[in-house]
A protein has these predicted regions:
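Residues forming the flavin
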Residues: 1-121
Length: 121
């Protein structure tokens, strides 16, 4: 079951739903605005909300699509679906390649500010 999927495109993260849900947020200029803290599965501090794409910070569309896969796999796993752990590793490797080099330096710096090791239950 899913109550809401929010999609947005732009140059500023659209994060009002995260604010309203009480997710922990951080202003991060490298990611072009306020974005939610998230773990490596793209889950926010709200246990039922994941973030991906422009809502997690403005970067390339290809990175947004990969983040969407990670968030989707994570949400499916949280609902009890079987998800291969290799899927997470494969998509994180893709993200690392997309964010590599000098071009991705700014994005990597921003992500370091909002990525957490995990959420306490």
């Amino acid at each position: 079951d899913c109550d809401v999927i929010c999609m947005a495109v732009g140059l500023t993260p659209t994060t009002e739903l995260f604010w309203q849900a009480g997710a922990k947020m951080q202003y991060c200029p490298q990611l072009c605005g306020h974005v939610p803290f998230r773990d490596n599965t793209m889950r926010t501090s709200h246990p039922d909300i994941w973030v991906a794409g422009d809502a997690s910070g403005i970067e390339e569309a290809s990175a947004a699509m990969v983040e969407g896969r990670i968030a989707g796999f994570s949400a499916a796993k949280a609902l009890g679906c079987k998800v291969k752990e290799e899927s997470f590793k494969e998509y994180w490797t893709r993200l690392d390649h997309l964010r590599a080099g000098e071009v991705g330096e700014k994005i990597r710096g921003g992500i370091c500010q909002v990525l957490v090791d995990g959420w306490e239950a």
